[in-house]
């Protein structure tokens, strides 16, 4: 296999966070797992939050997360950078700052070394942009490439955000445009324009660090990042955590391209959309809204924006 012949997205059945196990299936898998009680464990897996948080001192808590996925871009450097930005995002969603990371990688045994090197270089550069360091990792051979990071960061426990603190009357802010899941699926069908691909990749490579650094200056009550469970799925978790309902203007979110609705109408949708919709649609009232517009809101996003509940 020559490096020039490698089309990373052709080696994967699902792209990016579209490969994520659905929220409903995940809840069943974890339903009988006991949670060990620890007064210093501020956020564990039972909270369905973006990362775990463990209190070390009154002023310092450790933020822990891991995220990896199959290729969502053919260019190896771009893929590595997107995967890293996506993993780092969980720390930002908790209000924290990443400090160290470990590579998690699986590659075919015959993949050219220069391709693997470029994936890693993309990851390293994005982690360095975040002000953190990659300090090691683990790699295995697999027929399908996968890359991501285990990330550790820190947050002051008194300044930590969760996805369950929203207040009645809060305003919702989404910091990135939607449509990545539709566009990356359209790429596989040769139905996405170069401009749409560029817009999607640019969005996915953008760190949520910059949104985090702004939001800490405001009265923020809850935060989550919008990834594989879609805007609707992650908003549902936010609502359930606060025992609230939310109202969305379907024309409110920004979209990477108006073409995503036509693509959705034609059925160019990731498999994860159907998993997300099957799980969450019973909680959603969307009477009179065109099916394709709702479908896009259920589509998995990869390295999506922060969804912030803030006082008006």
Please provide the spans of the model-predicted regions:
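N-terminal glycine-rich phosphate/pyrophosphate-binding loops that anchor nucleotide-derived ligands
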Residues: 1-93, 132, 167-173, 177
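A generic local secondary-structure boundary/capping motif
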Residues: 41-43, 51-54, 90-92, 124, ...
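Glycine-rich anion-binding loops of enzyme active sites
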Residues: 57-73, 97-192
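Small-aliphatic-rich amphipathic alpha-helix that forms the alpha element of a beta-alpha
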Residues: 76-101, 118-129, 207-221, 226, ...
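Active-site glycine-rich loop that binds ribose-phosphate moieties when present
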Residues: 150-159, 195-215, 289-291
């Amino acid at each position: 296999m020559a490096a020039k012949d490698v089309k990373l997205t052709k080696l994967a059945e699902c792209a990016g966070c579209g490969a994520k196990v659905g929220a409903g299936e995940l809840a069943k898998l974890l339903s009988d797992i006991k949670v060990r009680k620890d007064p210093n464990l501020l956020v564990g897996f039972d909270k369905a939050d973006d990362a775990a948080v463990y209190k070390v001192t009154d002023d310092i808590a450790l933020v822990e997360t891991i995220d990896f996925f199959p290729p969502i871009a053919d260019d190896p450097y771009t893929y590595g950078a997107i995967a890293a930005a996506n993993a780092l995002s969980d720390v930002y969603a908790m209000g924290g700052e990443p400090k160290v990371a470990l590579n998690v990688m699986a590659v075919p045994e015959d993949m050219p070394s220069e391709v693997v090197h470029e994936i890693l270089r993309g990851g390293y550069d994005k982690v360095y942009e975040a002000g953190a360091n990659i300090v090691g990792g683990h790699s295995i051979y697999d027929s399908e490439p996968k890359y991501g990071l285990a990330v550790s960061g820190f947050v002051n426990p008194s300044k930590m955000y969760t996805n369950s603190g929203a207040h009645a009357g809060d305003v919702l802010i989404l910091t990135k445009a939607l449509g990545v899941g539709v566009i990356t699926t359209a790429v596989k069908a040769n139905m996405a324009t170069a401009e749409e691909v560029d817009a999607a990749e640019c969005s996915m490579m953008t760190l949520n660090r910059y949104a985090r650094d702004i939001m800490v200056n405001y009265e923020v009550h809850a935060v989550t990042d919008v990834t594989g469970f879609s805007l609707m799925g992650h908003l549902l978790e936010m609502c359930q955590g606060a025992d609230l309902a939310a109202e969305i203007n379907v024309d409110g979110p920004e979209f990477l391209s108006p073409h995503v609705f036509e693509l959705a109408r034609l059925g160019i949708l990731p498999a994860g959309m159907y998993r997300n919709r099957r799980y969450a649609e019973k909680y959603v009232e969307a009477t009179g809204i065109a099916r394709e517009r709702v479908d896009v809101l259920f589509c998995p996003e990869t390295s999506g924006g922060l969804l912030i509940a803030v006082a008006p």
